[in-house]
Amino acid sequence: MLIPPVLRTWAPKGRTPVLRHSYRRERLSVIGGLTMSPVRQRLGLYFQIYPWNVTAVEIVQYFAELLRHLRGPVIVLLDGGSIHRDRKVVAFCRSHRRLHLERFPAYAPELNPEEYVWTQTKRAVSNTCPENRDELLDLVLDALCDVQQSQSLLGACLAQAAKHGLIWND
């Protein structure tokens, strides 16, 4: 929806701050994932943005894009969302030997580094009032590209998840 997340406001004492927006039900959906090179030299962020709710079809397309861009085995960490357990997603993963799925424990978003990417993105678009979906798309795309191009931000997302217990084996 085109209702902005509000982080902070200001108004003269005794007056309620007002952030005007158009209450429209337009929205965007984003699929994304952090990548780490096998020798952990470089972090990456791959994402796709859709103007509709994401279904298993888009998840499969996203996985196909990952396989096209990344070499070697690809391990995907997923939360327990029902869309990730859809039969189309499971069938696609079984038919592509390079793709391995691992699941986060139930109700553990703090272990998912991608959740911290979404936090960074929401912070970047907070207190803005896009007039339409195209303006929202520009804001989200700029925010995601900023995160994508910053090794320190990507590293911070991974470090935050590790701080909460995400561990991986060498």
Positions of predicted regions on the chain:
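Extended, low-complexity cationic-aromatic segments
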Residues: M1-A64, Q160, H164-D170
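RNase H-like DDE/DDD metal-dependent nuclease/strand-transfer catalytic core used by mobile genetic elements
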Residues: L2-I3, A56-R103
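Short, glycine/charged-enriched secondary-structure capping and boundary segments
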Residues: P5-T9, V90-C93, Y116-W118
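Short glycine/proline- and charge-enriched loop/turn segments
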Residues: R8-R15, R98-L101, W118-K122
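Generic recognition of short, well-ordered alpha-helical interface segments
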Residues: R25, V54-Q61, K88, Y116, ...
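Conserved catalytic core of Hanks-type protein kinase domains
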Residues: G33, H69, Q120
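RNase H-like two-metal-ion nuclease catalytic core shared by retroviral integrases
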Residues: D79-G80, R87, E102-A124, D134-L136
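C-terminal anion-handling pockets and recognition modules
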Residues: E114-D170
